[in-house]
Amino acid sequence: VTTTRAGCAMDADGRIVFEVPQAHGRRLLLRLRPKKGLPEETLHVLELNSADEGRARAVLGADPVLAEGRWDVYLLDGSERTRLRPGPRDLRVLVDGHLRDRHAPLAVRVPYVTKDGFLAVRTWLRPAHAEVDRVDVTGGALTVSARLHGASMPAGAEVRLRLRRGEGTVRTLEPLVGQGGRSFTFTVADESLDIGIWDMFVRPAPGAPMIRLARLLDDVADRKNVFVYPGATAGGIVVRPYYTVDNDLSLEVKKTG
């Protein structure tokens, strides 16, 4: 079976243009990958229109807003569907995406190649977002700098570390907020953190919803094994920052040794 490859290019507004060999009467299908054991529910169909040199193009506009998750890309011929392999991907516009201020809600799309070699689109949809800029580990402390999108920090902002699977165990830190109320830094140097995984949030003002710290605004769909940080040793524990499978920033706390 000859495998069809789809090229794709993104523009600054978040539009994705897919290009495939001429496909008369066919369409492009994006399928939100269901959680294990659940049926698929969300499909999005795009028309393919003739382009130059025997090619066909489909455009995924900035609207509609796609649900957060992983969208597999198929060629649809009647009711038959075939997963597409990746052709050339032009994602240059995403590389410095963190430099542009975003508005709420934040809708992010990153085309990528799956582990088994097919084309997919990773999407995030967040009411507001705290984009991690730097993570510095020095000695027994780690310092995180980040920037808010879709929210600002007037006064009384706090960073919260929340123990996953803990009984509501939370540590609160005071961030250093930059001019303009968007950029902030904070340092974790706590020898008394419980062993386990701590998720990181910022609350921009008292009573405001908590915003997850993550790194979403570039061309890396799966950051976990690409950005690997050392641990900070404090007292009898090692605190290591890492990116989750959703590109959220968390802390892993282990005993030393």
Predicted regions and their residues:
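Basic, ligand-binding patches in group-transfer machinery
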Residues: 1-257
